[in-house]
Each structure stands twice: as C-alpha cells, then as structure tokens.
Regions:
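Nucleotide-activated donor-dependent transferases that construct or modify glycoconjugates
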Residues: 1-12, 228-234
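Short acidic alpha-helix that forms the nucleotide-activated donor recognition element
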Residues: 67-70, 212-225, 252
Length: 326
C-alpha cells in the first residue's frame, strides 16, 4: 500500500523549498500532494509538478487540508509560520499521524511543540537539517565540454571579470559590494520579484522581474556560465537561520557559487567547491578565483556535485527517520 504525504505552504512564497521534500518522499515511494497559496504568482509548484512527475490531481490550494486531512499518512508544514493557522488541530494531527514542521528558530519549538521538527540550516541541529534538492544530483554529461566558460570568461589572468547572477531582493544585502563590482567592470544579472532601483544608471546591471517558477528556471539556465553570487552581509539572518532558496538553484544547476566564508562554513560546502571571501567580493584573492581558468571552475563544479550527492544520501536518512521508515 502506498503512503501519502501532504506538503502544505500557507503563505505566498517558499514553494521552491517544497520540491526538496517532495523529491525525497517520491524517492522513498510515497505519493505526494502539494498544497500552496494560489495567490502566489511566482510559485514553483507547476515547475515542481512537471519536474517530479506529480499529477495535477495532487496539486491543491492550501485550504484543501481542512477537509481532507484524513487522506494523508503524514503532513509536512513547509514553514514554521504555517502552523499558526491551524491552532489545536496540530495536536490532533500529531497524535493520529506523523506531523512534521519546518522550523527556523529554536523558539519555534516552544511555540509549537507538536510534530517532528526539521530545519533548513544546520544552525540549530546539525542532525535534523535537510538541504532541499530536487533529486539525486549528477554531473551533467556535457559539463566537461561546456563551451561557455572559455567563450565568456577568458583564461588565467584575463582582465575580464565574469558576470555574476544574484537572486532575491538586495535590500539588507551588500549593495555596496554590487556597486563596487559593477564599477570594476563586472556585470551583474539580478532576479527578483520586484523592480530594484539601486542601480538605474549602471549599464552592466540588468534585472529580470517577476518570473514564475518554470520561466525563472529556464531563464536562469540560459545565463551561462552561471556564477551565482550571494551578497549577504555578516549581520544577516541568512548567516544563521534563514534559508536562501537561491542555494537550491545554485546546487541544482551546478553553478560556480560565490559567497562569504561564514556562509560557506554554515552549510559545510567544501572550500574547493565554491568561491568564498571574508568580507567583500572585491578582495584580491576572490577576484583572482573569479578569473580562474575554465578547467579550475570545472573542478569546483565537480566538487559541488560530489557534495550534493553526499547531502542527498544524508537527506534520505533523515527524512526516512521522520517518516518512521527503517
């Protein structure tokens, strides 16, 4: 008999994370239903359904759980805020079936002690965090002969800086670093839900606004080579508890990821799998790594793919335990 899992997202946003749990459940032989807020025009659910082979009859509005909770063997609440909508029903779900709740802060458990907790960063509990992946990763067959790196990047010591891609609002991020990179002759391609007004006069800055999941992934995949930058400042919540969905795309598309060293250490990316810097992307060592040869960038991507494979197996072990499987 096939078991069924409902993954519920009440709020607009966060739907890209749902794919990580759905992929694990599918791998373990579970039937998966995705429940989300249909007012979210930027949702990833349609993309995930096509990517993971989830039929349209298993895609619902978030409120579907209110009348159909008995149909599921397990319920996963995709963000810690969601449980506020359900009140006392959480205790019922926890006692009658396996309830899982994605928490972000340690205090969330005190507010909602029902169900099994899991996390999207290892900051709270390294043994209970899952890095969302859309399947068992593998290195693209064409990677070794990818012409884009030699076409656009240049060789060792080439003065040209690669274009950097960044995803999400730049408010509360390193806007100064973005500006400095542009002034140094680099290009920045920015994806966000809303129009950014920080760089109206910069000709080497471009933005893609308001793309839905499938359109977004198609556009992002076309930005070859993909140097994906996380311009996060030291005091940001992203450095501890808050998960950046852009990380999923960085690993899934096997990008060369560029990030603060503190961020690399948080997620345990190997030093040779990403390009990291202490406080600024403009540090001499970081700029040198950005100008590395295509062969060196290929080594980083291979190492990242290996890390993702290891992480997928760890994810499976954690999720299997949460579902009560041996």
């Amino acid at each position: 008999m096939t078991h069924s899992l409902a993954i519920v997202e009440r709020l607009p946003g966060h739907t890209e994370v749902m794919g990580g749990f759905a992929a694990l459940a599918r791998e373990l032989g579970w039937d998966v239903h995705l429940l989300f807020n249909r007012s979210d025009s930027f949702q990833f659910v349609d993309y995930l359904a096509a990517r993971l082979g989830i039929g349209g009859d298993r895609i619902h509005d978030w409120s579907y759980i209110n009348d159909h909770e008995g149909e599921f063997d397990a319920i996963l609440l995709n963000t810690s805020c969601v449980w506020l909508e359900y009140g006392g029903r959480l205790q019922q779900w926890a006692s009658s079936r396996r309830l899982m709740v994605v928490h972000h802060l340690p205090e969330d458990i005190e507010l909602n002690p029902h169900g099994a907790s899991l996390y999207l960063t290892p900051a709270v509990d390294p043994g209970k965090w899952i890095f969302p992946l859309y399947g068992s990763p593998g290195l693209p067959e064409s990677l070794c002969e990818n012409p884009h790196f030699s076409q656009h990047q240049g060789g060792v010591g080439h003065p040209e800086l690669p274009g950097l891609v960044t995803i999400g609002a730049l408010d509360l991020k390193d806007v100064g670093g973005v500006s400095a990179y542009l002034k140094a002759g680099g290009r920045v391609v920015h994806y966000d839900r809303h129009r950014c007004h920080f760089f109206p006069e910069e000709r080497d800055y471009s933005q893609h606004v308001g793309l839905g999941g499938a359109e977004f992934m198609q556009s992002l995949a076309g930005q070859q080579p993909i140097f994906l930058w996380f311009p996060i400042v030291p005091e940001s919540h992203y450095m501890v508890y808050r998960f950046s969905g852009a990380l999923i795309m960085g690993v899934d598309l096997n990008c060369v990821m560029v990030m603060p060293e503190q961020f690399r250490q948080l997620y345990g990316f190997p030093e040779d799998a990403v390009i990291s810097y202490q406080s600024s992307v403009m540090e001499t060592e970081c700029l040198g790594k950005l100008r590395d040869s295509p062969a060196k960038q290929l080594e980083r991507r291979k190492r990242l793919a290996a890390w993702a494979g290891e992480r997928w197996e760890k994810n499976l072990g954690i999720f299997r335990g949460l579902l009560g499987l041996r």
